[in-house]
Amino acid sequence: MGDPAPARQSDFIFLVALRDPAGIFELVEVVGNGTYGQVYKGRHVKTGQLAAIKVMDVTEDEEEEIKQEINMLKKYSHHRNIATYYGAFIKKSPPGNDDQLWLVMEFCGAGSVTDLVKNTKGNALKEDCIAYICREILRGLAHLHAHKVIHRDIKGQNVLLTENAEVKLVDFGVSAQLDRTVGRRNTFIGTPYWMAPEVIACDENPDATYDYRSDIWSLGITAIEMAEGAPPLCDMHPMRALFLIPRNPPPRLKSKKWSKKFTDFIDTCLIKTYLSRPPTEQLLKFPFIRDQPTERQVRIQLKDHIDRSRKKRGEKEETEYEYSGSEEEDDSHGEEGEPSSIMNVPGESTLRREFLRLQQENKSNSEALKQQQQLQQQQQRDPEAHIKHLLHQRQRRIEEQKEERRRVEEQQRREREQRKLQEKEQQRRLEDMQALRREEERRQAEREQEYKRKQLEEQRQSERLQRQLQQEHAYLNSQKQQQQQQQQQQQQQQQQILPGDRKPLYHYGRGINPADKPAWAREVEERARMNKQQNSPLAKTKPSSAGPEPPIPQASPSPPGPLSQTPPMQRPVEPQEGPHKSLVAHRVPLKPYAAPVPRSQSLQDQPTRNLAAFPASHDPDPAAVPTPTATPSARGAVIRQNSDPTSEGPGPSPNPPSWVRPDNEAPPKVPQRTSSIATALNTSGAGGSRPAQAVRARPRSNSAWQIYLQRRAERGTPKPPGPPAQPPGPPNTSSNPDLRRSDPGWERSDSVLPASHGHLPQAGSLERNRNRVGASTKLDSSPVLSPGNKAKPEDHRSRPGRPADFVLLKERTLDEAPKPPKKAMDYSSSSEEVESSEDEEEEGDGEPSEGSRDTPGGRSDGDTDSVSTMVVHDVEEVSGTQPSYGGGTMVVQRTPEEERSLLLADSNGYTNLPDVVQPSHSPTENSQGQSPPTKDGGGDYQSRGLVKAPGKSSFTMFVDLGIYQPGGSGDTIPITALVGGEGGRLDQLQFDVRKGSVVNVNPTNTRAHSETPEIRKYKKRFNSEILCAALWGVNLLVGTENGLMLLDRSGQGKVYGLIGRRRFQQMDVLEGLNLLITISGKRNKLRVYYLSWLRNKILHNDPEVEKKQGWTTVGDMEGCGHYRVVKYERIKFLVIALKNSVEVYAWAPKPYHKFMAFKSFADLPHRPLLVDLTVEEGQRLKVIYGSSAGFHAVDVDSGNSYDIYIPVHIQSQITPHAIVFLPNTDGMEMLLCYEDEGVYVNTYGRIIKDVVLQWGEMPTSVAYICSNQIMGWGEKAIEIRSVETGHLDGVFMHKRAQRLKFLCERNDKVFFASVRSGGSSQVYFMTLNRNCIMNW
């Protein structure tokens, strides 16, 4: 390569062709992309001289093209205006991979003409420079055309400049040799903006041809590029440019500053009829080309300009120049969105310095050539001196080569050391991060251990308190039995059946010496005496006016007992509440339309005949129905007696108070609701389900009454008709909070309460009225079903949020006639919602619900409730297709051990809750300023695992039973869960647990094949309104009024702020293009953000990305109202609705890599509010847009606008919701949704179906989802309908009116947001599951 003659260099390289390039050439960096491979800057190893190396994979498909390119280069590159071909090499690859072909060509260090123009002030070259470059291009083309070769890709990027301002043509990848007989080509290859009209016509018309004069057109476009900085139509999408070039008149220079010779030259080159276009020989004689200053003068001027532009480019860019091919690459494989395609390689600055050094060596080499010529002349005069000189030169070259090798080795050694240092630094950072992670894990484990230890201590403390309570209750039971015996003997109202063989558990009677009694017994008697004084008839007749009772101090002479030894901080401190917050929860009247009990009325207000609704227990005597024991509800409500239990007499007072309902008074019925009549969901529970487990009960000891009944049953003696109702205690708070515990020693029998012979109120009404009914029950013992009336347990799969041992037992009402199913599409959503089943804290109201007022505040010493009860109303499936609406009732009870095990499961982070929010160990501040004891118990749903699976009870699901028949593998899902009013509270520890939140974004669904849609929500509250969202991988980008955030669904649910103080109205993620398309900012501009830039704002792992601008605008549009990304085959269109126009953009792949203008439609008759694009039958493009008047269409080719559908029956303006193109209609038919209607029309405005889709209410959002269905979000319900028929497939009723907004959907997940009145928002998502709700 040391020989300057190109032919001899080519021969030398050709002799060693197909050798491995190792040791001969090495690659430095990527400088561009050719047609069939990447172009590198390379270096000759021995001399250090630079070369351009094109690296191509040798495949069978491209073998012919590569051979053609090699032949072209070998034959026709020996011209001063064509880059010289040096040779070819084959780099072997491992087996299974393609070998690499290296084509080595002359390196042009000054870059391309396009680079030169971009680095010139004003993006325009001087006319003299343009004339010189055009002349050199014409000379190169004349050489090619003389050999019947068409270049076919003349443009600024393929015209390179050397250091000495020589002009070289490159990229023969699309060159073709003309056939000797035909002389014309009909293939379609080239770059759109520089392409001649006859070449474009070849794609549209197979009979069209062109010849070498197509290069003349490209030369004229390149001249305009040098004069104006860019070719004509460069802002248009390449496809649009291909359409316009043959149809538009030839382009002209915009400015008038250019000379007439230059203007005439361009007009001559850009003659549309190629047969009239002059050949290269004639153009070389054109005045603009011929009448030029001397070549030396122009080259000096151009060389100075190149040097200046290189300095500027060195400051701005990191590469010397860029080769670029004419390919349009596929953008489906994660392209980077940054405009530069230059790779960053280690040691880049070192390479740049080395490049400058090598360029200086090139200059010295040129001087050495002159010296060599002088030496040749001396050789003829003095041969001997010449030989000596040659030896000297040889020795010097050897020394220089050694020095060069030493420098290269030193440089490689420094690079290796630098890499090692970097690797060590990375390893050290990784070790530090791992150490920090381990330390954090250790601290977390310690915190968890400390938490568990404290929890166990408090549990032990609660167990001690429970043992004390057992002792107290045992003593109180004995006192009660004695009082009952005395009163029965005095009044003689009932038969004197005294249990002679029954002994009380404790025998501290009144005859015993008080000194012999223990301290706690004397204390209890003292309290009983004082409470008995308060139980006078006067006090009973005014329960609502009774104020809080001051605490009774213990007797001073009494020695400290077990109660007094309890630490003060561990004793329950309950606030005294007013009369309107009664301390006693009330019985759920399971009798049809039983009267709701006021909150201020105690349990004994209801006569015992209310129990007639329950079937008889296992006792053979059906008249003897034992009074139920105190059974708290599933929400932990504990029914406590506020007075001393010894004051409870055996029968009612002879003069009952006026507020006790007479026995003959008919109970008032619950008013029938006339709206929100919900149809029931029935599915079978046969296949794939596991056997139902019995509801567990852990009785510790029987109560005295139960012992008496059992012994009488064993002896066969008759039993009394039942204990009479007990007189009520005062409604105020007891003086001793420790006495407010239900007796843990009494029997807790788990039983199923069947429905009565009437009709229960509907599930939705019961759910909404649960606070008025007072769902917390107080039962002395749960009635046990007789063998004939026992409900059959039904198999079911365990659901999230329901422990595995909880089973729903359903009872069909035998006397009830089956009702026909009510069509779901006829539902009414206009009912007034009184109460919400969600906790008020989550609803943001800041006030406890009425159910929570039934208890005197929360406890701080642990939950010692004997039993927790959950009442669930469900429907029964009947054989055939006729469902029964008789209500079945399940009473689920839990013992304290179960409560503690469930609490431990929650606190240990088990993912058994159906909501995505799990309890956390890190306490946070109380929301809404509530104190911990008065937090509403809606959160206990979550902390106790009682969250309703579909939507945490904030949505109730209904479907049309006529549509979905019961499947063989589905489980029966309860329509709603009626959980008793908030009685007791969890202890302070559990409250702290559920204050924080750890988001489990991929909760494990324990149901094997769930076919029921579920609604869940994320705990995170956004302070501003959520306007839009888009899925980025599995994570969710959320756009609000105040910025852009990322919700990490793959991790712990953390929210990362990406962009602040900017409004985001609409967004879409195009991951394959590395883009996020948005309408954002105050002016509603269409901005495109690079995902790699957003990713770096979270990871901060690429400093180079941080320096770049992370977004760009599409055009200069402001006031964008809506856009739509439409993918057709491999083309991505972007349709944008502006104030009075619609713009159509299309994605242009590399080298453009941006959305470019395709078509514009201005001055539309209606302002577009909603826009979409369709391709009719794969041929015709039409823009469909909705306005306040109706729906309209614009033909893209002709620009004609016409109306599609105008709802003339609506006089006012309408709100268009969605344009849905029906599947399998070739883009011709669509569903247009507006207001609360939807019509089926085709793109020509013809009604295709005499069906009008009618929503149940005015939706705020309408969206088409993957399951070929359409969803509407209203304030009262979410409706799901078939997109092809408009038939209602399902409804999710809200528990309260709220504004919902569709965000995005993918596969079987639909994301939407709820917006509160204060502007705060939360994200919900609905999982449609595998079958997309088609198998409900």
Swiss-Prot record:
Serine/threonine kinase which acts as a negative regulator of Ras-related Rap2-mediated signal transduction to control neuronal structure and AMPA receptor trafficking. Required for normal synaptic density, dendrite complexity, as well as surface AMPA receptor expression in hippocampal neurons. Can activate the JNK and MAPK14/p38 pathways and mediates stimulation of the stress-activated protein kinase MAPK14/p38 MAPK downstream of the Raf/ERK pathway. Phosphorylates TANC1 upon stimulation by RAP2A, MBP and SMAD1. Disulfide bonds: none annotated. Its cofactor is Mg(2+). The active site is at D153. Residues 299-347, 363-383, 395-890, 909-946 are annotated as: Disordered. This is Misshapen-like kinase 1. Its EC number is 2.7.11.1. The lineage of its organism: Eukaryota, Metazoa, Chordata, Craniata, Vertebrata. The gene is Mink1. Residues 317-333, 832-848 have a biased composition (Acidic residues). Interacts with RAP2A and NCK1. Interacts with TANC1.
